């Protein structure tokens, strides 16, 4: 439990994203099929890309996604993440300091 639990109307899920079965986890916690915001920032950025590939975009949609890829580190995470998100209908709205991409879905 946390200090904001009584004020929150959505679940707080804490765990190791590298091991999570997102479809099962989201279903267990009654995550809506359309989620307002997803933020992804794991270390190293190659792990963030691995986790991104496991998000069930075929079932869940996010209005806004911020995805930290640390492009300035030249780890090869920028293009694969962009291709994956664009394949699922996300539009790259903004890149911040060659470090983070902001995506939106305009069809929701």
Regions found by a protein language model. Name each.
Residues 1-33:
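Glycine-rich adenosyl-binding loop in Rossmann-like folds that engage adenosine-containing cofactors
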Residues 25-27, 31-108:
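Conserved acidic-Pro-Pro-aromatic motif
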């Amino acid at each position: 439990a946390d200090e904001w639990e009584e004020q929150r109307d959505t679940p707080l899920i804490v765990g190791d994203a590298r091991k999570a079965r997102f479809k099962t986890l989201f279903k267990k916690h009654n995550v809506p099929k359309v989620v307002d915001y997803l933020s992804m920032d794991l270390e190293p950025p190659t792990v963030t890309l691995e986790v991104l590939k496991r998000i069930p975009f075929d079932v869940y949609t996010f209005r806004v996604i911020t995805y930290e890829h640390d492009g300035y580190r030249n780890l090869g995470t920028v293009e694969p993440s962009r291709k994956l998100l664009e394949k699922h209908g996300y539009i790259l709205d903004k890149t911040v300091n060659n470090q983070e991409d902001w995506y939106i879905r305009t069809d929701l």
